[in-house]
């Protein structure tokens, strides 16, 4: 279910990325800090690159267990080697060993300082994994961050919100739409969707404000103006 094109981007794209987020730390705490045996007392970047190249060679040959071993050696030699963390995470993900991929993705995210496609892929994938496991307290941080990072991806917003709402986590669904409105303010359907959940939670006045916002963004739409009037009549 999780094997999407997003995952392939984790392996293929460059490693420069953005700021740390609290969710990554919580994943590391839950799944452990990926304690790897160190081969020496100091970081050896050159050795790390050597193991990384060997891991990539094995991965290209689809000798994944050998690739895993080399990537782990690379991380042991240089714990901040983002390429090795990302590629090892991607390998575990491909093999559907998701619990082993999670802390690696979290470590990769924490190392990043700029926004790139690799970071977007890592944050989005980790949010999907946590959401898929029902770890909503952890997934919400990644999901909100993914919306910030990928401001053109409106489809992921509805997937996130519907998952939370269907799981009885309406407040998280509301937070998703609020973040989406902040990042993509011109999308009236986000306001409409937010209003629907607020109505569901019997927050009618808040729902009315959301519908008014949608109507203001689409003044020629009778659908939104009618929604405003029907909601106002309930107060």
Question: Language model features by range: what are they?
Answer:
Residues 60, 94-95, 128, 132, ...:
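Register position in tetratricopeptide repeats
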Residues 53, 87, 94, 121, ...:
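Canonical tetratricopeptide repeat
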């Amino acid at each position: 279910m999780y094997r999407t094109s997003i995952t392939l981007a984790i392996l293929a794209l460059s490693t420069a990325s953005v700021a740390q987020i609290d969710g990554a730390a919580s994943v590391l705490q839950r799944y452990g800090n990926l304690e790897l045996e160190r081969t020496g007392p100091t970081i050896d970047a050159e050795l790390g690159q050597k193991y990384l190249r060997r891991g990539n060679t094995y991965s290209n040959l689809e000798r994944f267990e050998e690739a895993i071993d080399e990537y782990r050696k690379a991380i042991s030699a240089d714990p901040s080697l983002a390429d090795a963390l990302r590629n090892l995470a991607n390998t575990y993900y491909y093999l559907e060993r998701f619990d082993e991929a999670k802390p690696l993705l979290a470590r990769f995210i924490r190392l990043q300082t700029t926004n790139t496609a690799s970071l977007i892929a890592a944050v989005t994938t980790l949010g999907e994994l946590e959401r898929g496991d029902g770890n909503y307290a952890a997934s919400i941080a990644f999901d909100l961050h993914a919306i910030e990072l990928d401001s053109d991806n409106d489809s992921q917003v509805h997937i996130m919100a519907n998952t939370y709402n269907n799981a009885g986590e309406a407040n998280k669904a509301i937070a998703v739409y609020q973040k989406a409105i902040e990042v993509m303010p011109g999308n009236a359907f986000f306001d409409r969707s937010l209003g629907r959940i607020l109505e569901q939670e019997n927050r009618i006045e808040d729902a009315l404000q959301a519908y008014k916002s949608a109507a203001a963004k689409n003044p020629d739409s009778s659908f939104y103006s009618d929604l405003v009037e029907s909601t106002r009549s309930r107060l």
